[in-house]
Amino acid sequence: MRNLFIRESGLRILLLIFSLSYLLSAQAQPRQLLVPGGVAIINLEPGNDSGYRFLDKPVLVTKIEGKPAALVGLPLSLKAGEHFIEKSSADQVFKKFFEIKQKQYSTQHITITDKRKVNPYASDMERILAEKARKQKARNHYSMVDVDVDFLRPVEGISTGSFGRRRVFNGQKRRPHSGMDIAADKGTPVLAPSAGTVIETGDFFFSGNLVYIDHGQGLISLFAHLSEIDVNLGEQVEKGQTIGKVGATGRVTGPHLHWSLGLNGNWIDPALFLPVTD
């Protein structure tokens, strides 16, 4: 009888471990959201899973539940309706279709005390345009390496600015919010959510101290408004490594981390790469 109890108890423990492992692995996968600014997850056939493109840019291919799948970043400007990824091979063209629904993002009104950060001087424009080109290059960077899509939250804190919101600074309309804002004390360590390579750093007019990390296959993180930068250009960083500290540099209302996540050249909602509890 005692042996039966031990066997049953052991079975329950194994089942509990399996259930927890499955739950954690399920939470770790990116989540699909078929709206502008979201992510499409498209199943692919083994052996025919490379070379797919969306809007003429290569898409990230990884394993979802052990099977190949494409992760496709959907631009905020994308129209509702049918879209597809495609690849050409010899005389064949392969297409995978998916349907996008429209989403109405809310509007956020923000007061910036440093008016120069809303209406820059003419003397600022050369710097701003040069930095814009550097940002564009970093966002479109592509390296063909395996990607760990099991992301960590880069900093603990309260999310204060939602991705995709239409922003109005001092009564003037600006581009939609391209990332997630997380409020935290100045000096709080900012962690790399996944391994990658530092492809851009510097003190930028609007973004303040920033770091770009290439996670591979067009998956790019941007961390802005840092008080300190703790990594160097070209450095290989590990998941969980401190890359900088929370700050209030650039165009801000207070200390926080701005985290943008780019996929095949499009800014997407970073929350889709975090566990559902976040």
Q: Where do the PLM segments sit?
A:
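Bacterial N-terminal signal peptides
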Residues: R12-Y22
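Terminal peptide-recognition signature
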Residues: D56, I85, S159, I182, ...
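Extended, charge-rich intrinsically disordered regulatory tails
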Residues: V237, Q241-A248, T253, W259-D278
